[in-house]
Amino acid sequence: MFTQGSFSSEVTGTTLTNMEVTVYDSISAVPVYGDPALQGSTLPRVIAVYSDDQTVRAAVSAALGKKLPGEEREHKVLDFATADALRQYLGDKRKVDLFILDGEAVPEGGLGLAHSLKDELIDCPPIMVIIQRAQDSWLAKWSGADAVTSHPIDPFTLGSKVAELLQ
């Protein structure tokens, strides 16, 4: 699947030697969806936030900050305004460690998207959905969501739930 060894390059006019690299021999070997080989890694975790409402995406990003409570490792928040953009990102075999999906998003709601992701992705990362009404918690359960939070975004609740999901 991959090989490790030394690497020399003169791309920038500088020769890099004795650099440890991992070379993947196929697209299927690219680390995706919380690859166990990356456990203990210092790479930032990737949190994908989906909502058609920019204020919701901004509130989630602000609540998460750069690091979660009790975490030394930073994370990277990626905003997606459409489900199609999120699917395209995933179709490019890019890594995601956690999804946060707005159940109130239109035209495709986060609950339906969560259900689709759980069905379509092998080893799907954890999914948190944001709901407007407590009565919608049964829909969140149906969707396969691993956690639920509600509007308006509470930074303390969101941060602690996300930290729990990423452990």
Named regions from a protein language model:
Residues 44-65, 99:
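Conserved acidic segment of CheY-like receiver
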Residues 61, 96-118:
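Conserved phosphotransfer microenvironments
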Residues 71-81:
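Short hydrophobic/Thr-rich beta-strand motif most characteristic of the beta2 strand and flanking loop
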Residues 79-98:
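Acidic, metal-coordinating helix/loop segments flanking the phosphotransfer/catalytic sites
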Residues 91-94, 118-123:
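Conserved phosphotransfer cores of two-component systems
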Residues 99, 124-135:
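A short, hydrophobic beta-strand element within the central beta-sheet of small alpha/beta folds
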Residues 132-149:
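Alpha4 helix (beta4-alpha4-beta5 surface) of REC/receiver domains from two-component response regulators
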Residues 153-162:
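C-terminal output helix
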